[in-house]
Design a protein with these regions (language model features):
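Extracytoplasmic/periplasmic substrate-recognition and gating elements
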Residues: 32, 59, 163-167, 242, ...
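Glycine-centered hinge/linker elements that transmit conformational signals in sensory
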Residues: 182-189, 229-261
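Long, aromatic- and glycine/proline-rich binding clefts that accommodate carbohydrate-like moieties
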Residues: 129-130, 298-301, 350-405, 409, ...
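Hinge/lid segment of periplasmic solute-binding proteins
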Residues: 98-156, 210-213, 217, 299-301, ...
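Extracytoplasmic "Venus flytrap"/periplasmic binding protein-like
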Residues: 29, 52-131, 166-168, 173-176, ...
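Extracytoplasmic/periplasmic solute-binding protein
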Residues: 138-150, 155, 179-233, 277
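Conserved C-terminal helix/tail region of periplasmic/extracytoplasmic solute-binding proteins
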Residues: 30, 165, 171, 253-256, ...
């Protein structure tokens, strides 16, 4: 019996060893595979830059295999992320438009990152202290961290310095006010009879960009686009927004220094690079494109003010959607911390034009050298002193489109500004009604 038991034990141990050799522990089976949703078309420089970044991460983290999945625009990425959550197969991480986080949190579609921060032995305050204060408004909801700033932007004024000099203007002293910008645009607009051969200024207006530019102009006119403390209120039918939209429309229809109609962002940047527009308002994220493609000297400057200097934050944060499995969540958190480290944040900024959200990025030797050679990259960082959170509400996209649809009608000459803003406010209030019914209007 003893022999038999020893024999059986030996066989069992041998079997266990064989199993261990044939089926090693999970860590040895292979890396944890995670997807990262990235809002960009499949082709293009941003996709290549992200591919470089992800390859470097994978090479340095053999226990994780990250794959960048290119998901189109910010709006498209939100739609695809929500569909994947609903299907029970969310990506482990998403580069999500920073102003979508509130709506996602309301819908229970985000992972609260507080516990992951605590597991690292850190605190919310210490963790967020790495990033520029202006970015925290879109990352923190109800005192909890839901997003980590990654590639962020502000709008900038781009000026063709050569054309400015030709018009007798000094590009080293860019326009500071709406009045000065209007004067510059008049002087920079060229005509041959009734035909405009060079526009003074171009401002983008297509879904997403249009709302961001309206927020920008409203802020510089002293106003607030939305209630930063509550997701159920927007301020469309106000004097500050009326003044902003009226001035934008005046550039188009009264002064005729701006292309007619609503112009998408890519068309605006192409117009500037080709010399068809002497100035443009566009994202910091376009800076590398301008730097690499402009065949002329250019200048970037703060967005001019009417009442005050102010701009909204733009760009995206890294999030972990709700429903991600524990092992993938841990891997995603490792990826997020790596991507937002000073060194990688600095690299991404140099590659793309987005400013680095991690303040320590600007103390890295490579970034110091880069800024010495490319002082134009400093402007967006300097403008952060007057930056404010990006418009974020319940149903952010529909509420934004309630305004954008009306602004496009104005710029296309089909409505007057006041009429359009009254309609936008009415539509937005209707969109926000369900949220208000369950919050501010739900009384004891």
């Amino acid at each position: 019996m003893l022999f038999s038991r020893r024999l059986m034990l030996g066989l069992a141990m041998a079997g266990t060893l064989a199993s261990a050799l044939a089926f090693p522990a999970r860590a040895a089976e292979g890396p944890t595979e995670i997807d990262l949703f990235f809002p960009v078309p499949v082709d293009g420089k941003l996709a290549r830059d992200m591919g470089t970044l992800i390859k470097e991460f994978n090479d340095g983290h053999p226990d994780i295999k990250a794959t960048a999945v290119y998901t189109g625009s910010y709006d498209d990425t939100l739609i695809k992320t929500r569909a994947s959550i609903k299907a029970g197969k969310p990506p482990a991480a998403v580069i999500m438009s920073a102003n979508f986080l509130l709506d996602m949190q309301i819908e229970n579609e985000l992972t609260n990152l507080d516990s992951l921060i605590a597991a690292d032995g850190s605190t919310k305050e210490k963790f967020l202290g790495q990033f520029f204060p202006a970015l925290q408004g879109n990352a923190v909801i109800d005192r909890s961290v839901y997003g980590v700033p990654f590639h962020n932007s502000t709008p900038l004024l781009y000026i063709n310095a050569d054309k400015a000099k030709e018009a007798g203007l000094d590009p080293s002293k860019p326009p500071q006010t709406w009045a000065e910008l209007t004067d510059w645009a008049k002087k920079l607009t060229k005509r041959e009879g009734d035909k405009v051969t060079q526009w003074g200024i171009a401002i983008p207006c297509a879904y997403d960009y249009c709302g961001w530019m309206m927020e920008t102009l409203t802020m510089t006119n002293g106003g607030r686009y939305y209630n930063e403390e509550f997701g159920g209120e927007v301020y469309y039918d106000t004097p500050s927004m009326l003044g902003a939209l009226t001035w934008w429309n005046d550039l188009v229809s009264k002064y005729k220094v701006h292309p007619p109609g609503a112009t998408p962002g890519p068309a605006v940047s192409t117009s500037f690079i080709s010399g068809n527009a002497a100035m443009m308002m566009l994202s910091t994220g376009s800076l590398t494109y301008v730097r690499e493609n402009a065949k002329f000297n250019y200048k970037v400057a703060f967005i001019p003010r009417n009442v005050r200097n102010a701009v909204p934050i733009g760009g995206a944060s890294l999030i972990i959607p709700a429903g991600v499995e524990a092992d993938k969540q841990k891997a995603a958190w490792t990826l997020i911390k790596w991507m937002t480290s000073p060194e990688k944040s600095a690299w991404w900024s140099r590659a793309t034009g987005y400013f680095a959200p991690n303040m320590a990025a600007y103390k890295t030797p490579d970034m110091i050298d880069f800024l010495n050679k490319n002082p134009d990259a400093k402007t967006a960082v300097e403008q952060l002193d007057v930056a404010k959170p990006w418009f974020a509400t319940y149903k952010t996209v529909p509420v934004r489109k309630n305004l954008e649809d009306e602004v496009m009608l104005v710029l296309n000459g089909k409505k007057q500004p006041k009429e359009a803003l009254v309609a936008a406010q009415k539509a937005a209030d209707e969109t926000l009604k369900p949220y208000n019914a369950e919050t501010s209007l739900k009384l004891p």
